[in-house]
């Protein structure tokens, strides 16, 4: 069976009034043709693309999304903070240093210093996020039902400054608003990421995963605020589609929200009687890329997962398998 080429959608006028009257003969780029999605990769493979290239592109499909700092004090409810960093920039004279302004403070600190502060605090557990594919990220919700979404959530505690910094950048890009999404920030992060790429070894899978996530969010954010992305194939496809239907960032007609916010039914919901997430547990700014994190149903899933994570995720299971050199045996 021949696969339909998804690169372009063409509106043809077939009679009658409606949207097609004003869009007759207009070619609109398909979201599957403009973004590196799985469907597009299959199409490219059928057209003769080298298999190794397809595998390399498939590797970037998994994305860390809705990153929050996880903090918990014994006897108190946990807190998941996506608003702990209110400003971020790369130091001009030392482009491997990321400076941040923390919520409630006015002075800049380096991520190196912030990392040391966090790892010495008993309440700091690490970062939580969900692992989604590009097409599962649907702007206002996620394409994974709650009963399955909890198996996509993970807790990651960085053991080095670079991985910690990448988590902070992910969290900041998701929560940034229109006023903070500046060309200057985009250029700074692009230069920083080029330096980071040189520090990713073939076995450092987690670092590569975080790095690829930053690339997706950076290019998507640029597209949302009408800047040309550095890499157009790294724009999340549903953000492209919503942008075509509604060019004004940060707002959307009710019909678009309805399309992207439809539920999955009770069969795939969390167990009956699951309590909602208490107020104040998830603290999230009104960002351009964190719509689902502000949704009460997503927060409910996060809270349920946190309370039951030892049952959902076996103790010794890691997000990525790691390989270490075996000790040399001297004879």
From Swiss-Prot:
Record keywords: Host cytoplasm, Host Golgi apparatus, Virion, Virion tegument
InterPro entries membership: Herpes_UL7
GO cellular component: host cell Golgi apparatus; viral tegument
Main location group: virion
Keyword Transmembrane: no
Family: Belongs to the herpesviridae cytoplasmic envelopment protein 1 family.
Oligomeric form and interacting partners: Interacts with protein ORF7; this interaction localizes protein ORF53 to the host trans-Golgi network (TGN).
Protein's name in the database: Cytoplasmic envelopment protein 1
Source organism of this protein record: Varicella-zoster virus (strain Dumas) (HHV-3)
Taxonomy of the source species: Viruses, Duplodnaviria, Heunggongvirae, Peploviricota, Herviviricetes
């Amino acid at each position: 069976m021949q696969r339909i080429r998804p690169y372009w959608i063409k509106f043809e006028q077939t009679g009658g009034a409606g949207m097609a009257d004003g869009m007759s003969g207009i070619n609109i780029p398909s979201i599957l043709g403009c973004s590196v999605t799985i469907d597009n990769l299959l199409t490219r493979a059928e057209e003769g693309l080298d298999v190794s290239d397809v595998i390399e592109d498939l590797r970037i499909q998994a994305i860390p999304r809705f990153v929050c700092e996880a903090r918990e004090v014994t006897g108190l409810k946990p807190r998941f903070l996506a608003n702990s960093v209110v400003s971020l920039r790369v130091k001009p004279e030392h482009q491997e240093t990321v400076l941040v302004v923390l919520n409630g403070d006015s002075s800049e600190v380096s991520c190196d210093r912030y990392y040391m502060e966090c790892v010495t605090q008993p309440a700091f557990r690490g970062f939580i996020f969900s692992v989604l594919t590009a097409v599962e990220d649907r702007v206002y919700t996620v394409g994974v039902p709650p009963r399955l979404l909890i198996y996509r959530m993970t807790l990651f505690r960085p053991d080095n400054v670079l991985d910690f910094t990448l988590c902070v950048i992910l969290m900041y890009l998701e929560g940034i608003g229109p006023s903070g999404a500046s060309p200057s920030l985009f250029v700074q992060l692009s230069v920083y990421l080029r330096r980071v790429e040189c520090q990713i070894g073939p076995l450092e899978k987690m670092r590569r995963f975080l790095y690829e996530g930053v690339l997706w969010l950076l290019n998507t954010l640029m597209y949302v605020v009408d800047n040309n992305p550095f890499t157009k194939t790294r724009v999340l496809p549903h953000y492209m589609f919503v942008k075509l239907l509604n060019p004004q960032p940060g707002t959307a007609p009710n019909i678009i929200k309805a399309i992207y916010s439809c539920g999955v039914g009770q069969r795939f919901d969390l167990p009956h009687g699951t309590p909602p997430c208490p107020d104040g547990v998830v603290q999230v700014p009104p960002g351009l890329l964190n719509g689902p994190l502000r949704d009460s149903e997503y927060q409910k899933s996060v809270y349920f997962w946190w309370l039951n994570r030892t049952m959902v995720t076996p103790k010794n299971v890691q997000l990525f398998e790691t390989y270490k050199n075996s000790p040399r045996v001297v004879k």
